[in-house]
Amino acid sequence: MAFSVLAAVLTQTKVRMAQMLETGKSFKITHFAVSADGHDPLDPTTARTPDPSETDCGSVIFTKAFVPGDVTYTSPTCPTWACNLAAGDVTGSVSQICLIGTVEYCPNPLDTECVLPATEFVVAIGTMPLKVITIHDTVTFNVSIQF
């Protein structure tokens, strides 16, 4: 199964991107997290709208690192990450995918965000109606962000 998800870039990410232009501190999207926090609890067929001020992914049930080849470009300003779940990775309810960034470079060697383990943060959140995944399902969530 494959699903397309358009994720909202969070305010904290926009702040980091603005600071990157000044300081050179950089990050990249390194992994994703899955939760069941993306649907309307009163109507699971409806995705909730992500709040750009959110800073975490809620009740995470699974995380996985991206590997080379997991990102493609729908257009020059629209990267898409393939969030691949193998059979047995997740069972149960899924309605939210979070793209997680890791600080990769700090021009100031005393910056604590670059001390290992490097700082990680939620870059973007994609929500969808509730999906139920069984132990035998192989699922790909194609998560895009737009600039």
Describe the function of each predicted region.
Residues M1-S95, T102-F147:
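Small cysteine-rich, disulfide-bonded extracellular modules of the LU/uPAR three-finger superfamily
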